[in-house]
Structures are given as C-alpha cells and as structure tokens.
Amino acid sequence: MKITVLTGGSSEERDVAFASAVQIVGGLRERGHQVAVVDTVTGVLSPEEERGVLKGSVGTTPPSTRELVARERAFLLSGLGALREVQEADVLFLALHGGRGEDGTIQALLDTIGVPYTGSRSLGSALAMDKDVSKRLFRDAGVPTAPWLMAPVSAGDVTKELGWPVVVKPSKQGSTVGLTVVKRPEDLEAAVWYASEFDDEVMIEQFIPGRELTVGILEGQALPVGEIIPKHEIFDYECKYTQGMSEEIFPADVSESVAAESGRLSVISHRVLKLGGYSRVDFRLTPNGGLSV
C-alpha cells in the first residue's frame, strides 16, 4: 500500500509526534509498504530530513512552537491537499499529537479532501480533546470522573467545591502540557495564568490520589489494563518521555473486578466520545478501590 504518515505539527507536542512517527514509519516499511512522511508545517520530508527529525527521543520539556502555528495554517489551507503524496495515498496514517492534529481540525480537512485516514473522525477528535466537554459526557453516561470547575473561579470556591490539592490544566492540551498540581490557595492564580498560556480555557480539577491505570481500546474492545508508575507525583511530561522516569506494567497487578470494571468503563468512554478505531483511557485507582477517568 501507499501510506503517507502525517506528523510534526505546530503544537507543543511536536516532538512527541515525531517520536510516534519513528515507530509507525519503521513498522510500515518493515512490512513492505511504500511510505512517505509529511510534516504538517514544512511538507514532505526528504530521507535526510527524516533522519534529522525522526529520532525517537523527546526532551524533558515541551518545545516552544508558537512561530510554527501560522506556517502550519498556511500549509494546511493551500498545500496539503495538493501534495501527490496525499492525493495518491491509499490511506493517511496520523502520527500527530495535540493542536490541530488531535482536535478534529485536520480530520475535518481530510474529510473535505476525501482522503481516508486512521483514527477517529473530526467530531470524536474534537470531543476527546476538550476535557470539559468530555467530563460532562462522562458524567451523563455514569462514568466516574473527578469533580471540576472552570476558570475564572476564586480560591474560596475551589476550597468549598473541590478542596485541596487540585490539578490546574489547559482544557484542550495533552501530555500534561501546562499542568500544575496546586496544594495551597495562594498558588492558584499563578497556575491558572500558566495554563492559560496553552489554551483559552482552564480547568481546575480535584486531585485524586492513587495508582495510574491505563486501558487501550482497539476496534471497540478493551485491551488488558496496564499500570504506569512515574518517578514524580504525577505522570508528567518528563516522566512520559524520559527513559527511566516511569515504569510500565502490563498487565497491571489488580484484582479481576478492577480489571473488568476499568475495561467496561473504557469501552463506555470510547463510545460516549464517538471515537473510532483506537483510543486509550486513563484512570486513577484510589486506595479504597474506586476508579476515576
């Protein structure tokens, strides 16, 4: 097959996208597919450019990519659909993280062009990227999720509604970009300002202590539950992408009931968000055995 991998992009997760593309491109070529690689900011990558950016490693902090946003917008509007590598591809494999690559923008553009692509459609991508909307849908579907408020909100309201500590984060970001665990009311304002650098909406969520579990979904079926043990208090950007900063255990050492319930809730979450193909649902397993998406 002729497969074009879309990667890079202008979000703070640009390096993460390249790291994903390393595995995808290598795996596809090993299986005999004809693979082209397109950065949604710069266009088709030559073999030399591939070697330069597809390194498989990610820095300990997300890169500043604001200067790339306008370039990506211009390329998507005028260049992507005109590329031979896009027009002649049997399918586009999306290796994009954050920003337009995950929020439904590129998916909607590809629907307009009429090119098949992997992953969820534009609506599912948009729903899953927006944490506030996702949590509202989870709540309505009976999926347990931590209580939350949306900024602006006073420290007094947070004390009354959520208690401390809380997690302050951009509503539409991934990889814990812009996230802070806030333990004192006097630190709330700074955390909200920091999160607002990455999104125009900021969520303040009750901190749920416990173990970090994750369940993959493939074609509507839950895969075995795994556990992630980070070196830090939370599974932050550094722990996600720095070798040795976290331990991943598959399958997780949990009871049969926890494994079954996490799988059940993952399938519900996948369906509620109208996702397609594959997804991943992360949980906190509390000391008393409760699960929270």
Regions found by a protein language model. Give the residues of each.
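ATP-dependent carboxylate activation and anion-phosphoryl transfer catalytic cores
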Residues: 1, 7-10, 139-142, 255-293
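ATP-binding N-terminal substructure of ATP-dependent carboxylate-amine bond-forming enzymes
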Residues: 1-123, 127-129, 133, 137-140, ...
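Phosphate-binding site of ATP-dependent enzymes
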Residues: 183-264, 285-292
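A short, local hydrophobic-aromatic micro-motif
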Residues: 118, 146-147, 223, 235, ...
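Active-site nucleotide/adenylate-binding loops and adjacent lid/helix of ATP-dependent enzymes
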Residues: 3-7, 19, 35, 83-87, ...
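Generic secondary-structure signature for well-ordered alpha-helical cores
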Residues: 30-33, 143, 196-200, 230, ...
